[in-house]
């Protein structure tokens, strides 16, 4: 894969030059969240405001298989590839639990952000911050995407619906 990307870069393929995006969503966690857990120790977290985005052990019990799927998701470059991975998971293990669906949506968000030319996508409350990658800014004064002069806002309150709203926004 690295060799293919390097050859494509040398040929001037724009997709090969695409930078990786970092996704930081304040309403997701990459593991099981308990009542006492919080990304910031001094901040109390209402567990209903946070969704786990991970591959649960009860869904795919074998560690090696979970790692393989995490690797596939990390290497995914577009939404179609993420969809194919989701179908493979469902074929292999059955109905996807909410956490696995959230992980797939979070990965799709990363892929869509990369396609849109963002190197970072973050949420802070209802605010959605999409930072343009170097060389991708529409003008030199704005490093963040703005709609009508403001950062985009999320209207959904429930974490899973927020993920879907971000996907719709990026499409």
Q: What label would you give each PLM region?
A:
Residues 1-171:
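Accessory helical-bundle/CTD segments and flexible terminal tails appended to RecA-like ATPase motors
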